[in-house]
Swiss-Prot record:
Assembly: Interacts with host TBK1 ad IRF7.
UniProt protein name: Protein MGF 360-11L
Function: Plays a role in virus cell tropism, and may be required for efficient virus replication in macrophages. In addition, inhibits the phosphorylation of host TBK1 and IRF7 and thereby negatively regulates the host cGAS signaling pathway and antagonizes IFN-mediated antiviral activity.
Entry's family note: Belongs to the asfivirus MGF 360 family.
Organism: African swine fever virus (isolate Tick/Malawi/Lil 20-1/1983)
Record-linked InterPro entries: ASFV_MGF360
Pfam families: ASFV_360
Amino acid sequence: MLPSLQSLTKKVLAKQCVPVDQYHVLKCCGLWWYDGPITFYVYRHKMFIRSTCFSEGIELNTVLMKAAKENNHDLIRLFAEWGADINYGLICAHTEHTRNLCRELGAKDRLDRDYILKIFFDTTRNKTDSNIILCHEMFSNNPNLKNVDNLDLREEIMWELRGLMEITYMLDHDNSFSNMLTKYWYAIAVDYGLKKAIHYFYQRYTHLHHWRLMCALFYNNVFDLHELYVIERVRMDIDEMMHIACVQDYSYAAIYYCFIMGANINQAMLVSIQNYNLGNMFFCIDLGANAFEEGKALAEQKENYLIADALSLKHYNPVISLLSVIMDPEKINCMLKNYHSINMRVFLDYERR
């Protein structure tokens, strides 16, 4: 769609740093939203909007969805003229009047399955607090997603969260599509350490406190783990927590945290072997695990002969510096951020001979 001279002028104005005493000009031009100015900028060839409700900046296509959900026709027209894909607006248009406007501006009569899936995952790509919260608001309980078989999105989300979903499936009996979407956004927030988004979900979804704890363990987020376990006092069986921490390799901070809280380190070693996680296995040995015979038998049973050979050596010892009790997540992160297993080095040196 060709932009009008008026919309081009607004675009130029939206790129400027306008002083507070001239905000009335922005209001008169329709560049005002949620009690703040609308700012336009380009970053890495993508167009972004910044306003009071999303100070980090949101992609123009995503902001169009919010305008459509709110039936804000002036902003729908403006964002479309600035270059937004009007089909994104159709996803969140819940009234016939707004749907008709989107079609007048060039939207398709009906979005097919593949296009909706593309919009869904393109929108999720920007991992910021504002964007993840907005994605949740735009897609959760969205009747327009019924055009996509829920199974399609379920499969995609299950694939994105495959390790986490596999170990937590039996712990959550609410398998509704809406609940799965919320868990998806929540998991992204914990994975990327998005504090505002994490607390947004924490305040609104009290039934998902354990899900947040599982995500913190799975994604090795020791800061969130500490906040939940010690400050918020969200509780799970400590060995169950250690099991989740061991599923992804090199989750040293989460494993260490569970260890100092009393989890069975030999059991952690076996879970690591079960999941073919060589890094986690050696870290457990660094922490004093000694289930060598049982671990070797398990590795041979799973035909993982590299691990079986590693466990045949008799030269491993606990790392004394790791055995002091540290609870501060900042200190744990600092200690383990660039940690290389001493016992793994023993094995690698032996292999090079």
